[in-house]
Amino acid sequence: YTGTTSSAASDVYKRQILFYARLAAPLSLLFAVIYFGTNWITSRRTDNHQLYLEWELAIPFVPSMIYMYASLLVLLLLPAFTLTRSQLIALARSLVAALFIAAAIYLLLPADLGFVRPDHVPGYNAVFQALFALEMPHNLVPSLHVATSALFIAVLYRSLSSVWIRAGLILWGVLLCASVLLVHQHHVLDVVSGLLLGYLCYRLVYRRAIERT
């Protein structure tokens, strides 16, 4: 029976991962089209705004925080192992809402990054050059990096009951928010507005979708 039970559990996980992958594929395509499309548009505009304060430019550049910044990719995988299908669908809807709201704000309020991007980052150059190639510094307010982090952490926090895991999720979220500042990808307003967007999509889209199921 143990072998049969293990095999059945393995099949359930496989089906769950495949289901998540089928959700993630079109979402990733939609993200690429919307995010890079709006960035392309705003990079060609001349009415971009300075949405930061001068003191923020004194925030230190900490290259090693790029690992924490990139840990969002790990966070994105966790729902496949912890959420039900109805929860995954609700999460996908929440992400779409966050993406379109952010895109509308990017077009209405295009911004310029105040930090000067370095030409060379010793020890991390390849990683940062790849990041700079993907992200033109105009889709700033709100930070989708932060909004996505906040949304996923809120959803996982709700679904997992362990006090230690919940505490770890909160710490992870704090470090993710700090990382976008310390690798000079965003400013303070971007982080605050990203947190607000993530929370609103969690409360108004995810929670309502779950309550209807």
What residues fall within each predicted segment?
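Aromatic-anchored segments of alpha-helical transmembrane domains
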Residues: 32-33, 99-108, 171-183
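Membrane-embedded catalytic cores of phosphoryl/pyrophosphoryl-handling enzymes
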Residues: 128-213
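Alpha-helical transmembrane segments of integral membrane proteins
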Residues: 19-27, 68, 89-97, 165-169, ...
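Residues within membrane-spanning alpha-helices of integral membrane proteins
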Residues: 8, 66, 73-76, 96, ...
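N-terminal transmembrane-helix/juxtamembrane module of multi-pass inner/ER membrane proteins
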Residues: 10, 14-74, 111, 118-128, ...
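Hydrophobic, lipid-facing residues on alpha-helical transmembrane segments of integral membrane proteins
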Residues: 22-37, 92, 96, 100-104, ...
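Membrane-interface loops
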Residues: 39-54, 81-165
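Single conserved hydrophobic/aromatic residue that forms the stacking wall/gate
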Residues: 1-13
